[in-house]
Amino acid sequence: MDLTRRQFVVGCSSAIAAMAGGRLGGLAFAEPGDINRDIFVVVFLRGGCDGIGIVSPLDDANFQAARSTITFPSSGTGAGFELGSLSNVPFWLHPKAAAFKELYDSQDLAFIHASGLTNGTRSHFDAMDFMERGTPDNKSTSTGWLTRHMAATRPDGVVPVMSTGSALPASLLGSPNAVTISNVQRYAMQGYSTYGAQQQASLNEIYSQTGSLLDGPATRLLSSIAAVKARNPANPYVPITTYPAGGLSDSLKAIAQMIKLDVGLQVATLDFGGWDTHESQVPILGNQLDLLTRSLHAFYNDLVDYHSKLTIVVMSEFGRRLKANRSAGTDHGHGNLAMVLGGNVNGGRIFGRWPGLANAQLDHGVDLAITTDYRTILSEIVVRRLRNNRLGLVFPQISQYQPLGLVRGTDLTIDWTSGFRSYLPMARR
């Protein structure tokens, strides 16, 4: 049929509005997802969180000498929570992380200390880029590690991958499957609701005839909007637990809602910034931890029916310097703390190997050394929980699979074939 000028204008305006409401990275949707697939949520703490200030070796003389003015006590008022030992060194959890202590005691939460990006950069942007592309020392990698993981597993589902930010993170760079959704109720054609059906019909008609490279992505975006709308009631989402107020909780609720809509969500990412504590670290870190731990605790309880297939990892680009600075803060460091939460996590433990805090044991004599590459943590989750053995593709620079025992699952025969060069162009449309 011939398009009228009115159809063209309505369709184009709605297309622009639709793209603003749900940005995409070259979507590729299929049939609804396998309900047995695991769900993986990545929480990135932007700014370099102070891992050694969250899980601390309070009895260590070197630690006290470096941080006595900015740490918490092991007993008395404001005391931390005892966690147990790593490498025969006892550790305490920050007192503002009480919600994490509950998850730790229920054996759903594990910590991995002295972990992180082995590249020595102290640049926020370089470190985040290296980590999220999954190729330390190589910023020219044109895809993110989660993009390559999803390519290896041939994702199905209406919305297999989502991010709650305004743009996709580098871990989803080049993804043909990912959308950004910060508010599920607003994931729709924007404009007057009276004309919503007409706008969508016009846009479908335009893209069915143009033959442009945008046809596939636009049509798939419309399909995802229609599928979410069909499953999503008009009323705001009502969780089964109470979340604290704030943007972090809003992002977590959006993910929880998408999981419950059964649209085949397999991977979700979100960012939580504000961890660059160069000054006044005690109040800032305490407030950040309180919000992070209570929000994740609420999110986990909200998804109680999904615990058996839910894994959450929390990480940051680097840790902080061991010694406090003159502004009652800490500067950019190296070794850090990662956290893994889920129904198949071997929680209630601290994993890794503690390197010590004597000068000779520190990285460059000033920072906590790294004894566990962050890719070791992610690789175990990818293999045992996400059932992907293509580590050569996901993390092309590693050559060994050395699980720590973080999560339960089957160790597959690892395929070290990278397939990296052939995949980089992302020519699939």
Please give the residue ranges for each predicted region.
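Feature for exported/extracytoplasmic and membrane-associated proteins, marking the mature portion
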Residues: M1-D305, K323, L337-L341, N346-T417
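Histidine/acidic-residue-rich catalytic or RNA/ligand-binding cores of hydrolases
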Residues: N325-A328
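Glycine-rich and small/hydrophobic secondary-structure elements
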Residues: H334
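Short structural boundary motif marking the start of a folded domain
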Residues: R421-S422
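Conserved functional hotspot residues at active sites or interaction interfaces
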Residues: P425
